[in-house]
Amino acid sequence: GPALTVSTACSSSAKVFASAERLIRLGLADAALVGGVDTLCGSVLFGFNALQLVSAEPCRPFDAERSGISLGEAAGFALLERDDPADRASIRLVGW
């Protein structure tokens, strides 16, 4: 099946899930492994700093006096499959 990389900033994961759903719905694929990874690099940190979004103080995201943002790295993947009623009894949802 198709293999592609999508880089549309914050919307990348939404785009790959929508694309995978469309391929499955149209019958072009029975399943799709989709995922997203976000890593921090110097240019990202410099960009947020240039926008004055990085606080000089520690970030307190749940504080009424909060400022700045919390940047982090993450990865997530999911297997999307065609819904087949005959297979429902044997499907086991697993995750970490």
Where are the regions a protein language model picked out?
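Active-site-proximal alpha-helical scaffold in enzymes
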Residues: 3-36, 71-87
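Acyl-CoA/ACP chain-elongation machinery
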Residues: 28-50, 55-59, 66, 96
